[in-house]
Amino acid sequence: MAGVKAGLYLQSSVSALRGVGPALVSRLQHMDLWRVQDVLFHLPSRYQDRRHIASMATLQAGQERAILGEIVRVDHQRGGREQWLVTVSDGSGCLQIRLFHMALALRAQWQVGRRLWCFGELRGGFHGLEMIHPEWQMADVPQFQAPHHLTPFYPSSEGITQAQWRRWIAHALTLLDQLPDYLENRLPPQWPGLREGLRLLHESADEIPSPQHPAWQRLALEELLANHLAVRRMRQSGMMQNAPCLRSKGQMWQRFLAHLPFSPTMAQERVIAEINADLARHRPMRRLLQGDVGSGKTLVAAAATLTALEAGYQVAMMAPTEILAEQLHARFQQWLEPLGLEVGYLVGSRSPRVRRETAEALAGGRLSLVIGTQSLFQEGVAFACLGLVIIDEQHRFGVEQRRQLLEKGAMPHLLVMTATPIPRTLAMTVHADLEVSVIDALPPGRTPVETLVMPDSRRPELIGRMQHMLEAGRQIYWVCPLIEESEILELQAAEASVADLQAALPGVAVGLIHGRMRSAEKAEVMAAFQSGAVRILVATTVIEVGVDVPGASLMIIEHAERLGLAQLHQLRGRVGRGAQRSSCILLYHPPLSGKARERLRVMRETYDGFSIARKDLELRGPGEYLGTRQAGILQMRVANILRDEALLAMVPALAERLLQEDPEAVQAIVQRWLGNRVDYGQVG
């Protein structure tokens, strides 16, 4: 193969590999393996050491061993399930090989006197130790080769065997010399080059390579770099656009503060200043605002909104659910209507006439502020001069949804907010398209919620505690989490809890809110709870974000072992919003798994959202932690964002150097690792 042709061959379809026909091409593509080069970067998940031949005299049940010996007996048993029992000896002892379903062509090979190599797991049989269907080769033929390196095992699905993987990768490795190393002389000198590292990981002859091995680290760093560069490319494409300059004298903000019964915290003032500086520029703001539950992100959003409105531009604020959108709308009405500002509301449950009138007011410029759900970026909704988009609970939306809403304006500024904090090193990769601001202090008067963990068997004791709190005029949340992703079972569990509470606490008004209710029904129940007419609110996790009822000071979460740390922390944040001391009780049903026990321990001992987020990331891993929408391009083949945190710290400086010195390498690295998963023209 000529060099240039081989180099191009790495970019060819996997169909170029020996033995890969149309059916296998489809299976490989389902695993996101499209090119020969992709197969090279499909790394082993584990290894077996088959290089050493074990003496049969030393074998023990439960071991995995390679043996080499002579076939001394072959028994063909036809009674019941047809099988072959082959006895092999190496002079020190004997071993029986048990085989089923042997093809005719293979049966002829199993002859007394032939030499046989086998690898498999040993187990006790009727006649001593045996292997059932081991991997084997006849050792008395010229083509026999005993393994001279560790045997790799590859992640697999779609019915692809390990033998197929090893054959394809051996083929791809013949092209390794044509693989360019774009990071040569830019990495620690003790690390191998790209080609050397790949060969070592596929054909390791010494130690079993762990994720801490320099070869693994070399590839993990390049993958992290590719993801960082891809998201950064999106950001840079947005920075080249002109955005409206939203300068204001702060007159609306000062009038707003005059009506506010409290003052912003220093952390809020710092973040507001960062946002206002962004808004005053002619390039589009792309900023992520992270803040713990109850840290005051909504007030910061109000400050940004007033800056945009005073500058003469429209503002759109999007929430992931109607119940949260309704809460935001009510809050902004309370804050802004005294200033003479109308707050629009656009959600799917509103009547077609109201939605049409709201859309017409936005298009005509008669309405400057609208709060809603995904309805905001549907067809038929246009803005006269959209200057600022605010997205609450950012982790619920993907890049595509953000982009659709941004397209409603010429190039509006973007502020995304989340109470699900992401550790800084992770944010540098996940949100390389966004500047990050953090509200790192709670408003004065907010005290940590006392958190107790108790088994469900102590429910009678809990009812007594609830009775005492109700007599003191308090309100209570009772949360029933989703059961097996079934809304019907969820509803049944919630209704059963309502019946139990009504029986245990006669005369107490108990409300119910669940996922199968219409938005108007949910809003009615929430209004009754906020007014105090409903004393206990039984709910599913639909109340986990944004709901604000200062009179609620006790949160009880049933089956707390089913929920993740982020959900538990979000739910706990619904109490402790008034002046009184608040509590959260986590009810669990034993036995607990190790991870569930650890989650409940963290909740009992920790109130800091960033510490909880870090632990959540450790327990769940980056993919599950971020979710499919938010993870986006972070479907890592080699790297692990948590494990490779030290590598993440190296990425920004390396990316900066590459962008300045070798822009072509940037494109090639991103293409190598992400293929067609990134649309470089998109703005994050």
Swiss-Prot record:
Span list, region Wedge domain: 51-148
Encoding gene, per UniProt annotation: recG
Pfam families found in the cross-reference section: DEAD, Helicase_C, RecG_dom3_C, RecG_wedge
One GO MF term attached to the UniProt entry: ATP hydrolysis activity
The protein, known as: ATP-dependent DNA helicase RecG
Function as written in the Swiss-Prot or TrEMBL entry: Plays a critical role in recombination and DNA repair. Helps process Holliday junction intermediates to mature products by catalyzing branch migration. Has replication fork regression activity, unwinds stalled or blocked replication forks to make a HJ that can be resolved. Has a DNA unwinding activity characteristic of a DNA helicase with 3'-5' polarity.
Domain notes: The wedge domain within the N-terminus inserts into the replication fork junction, where the lagging and leading strand split.
Disulfide feature: none
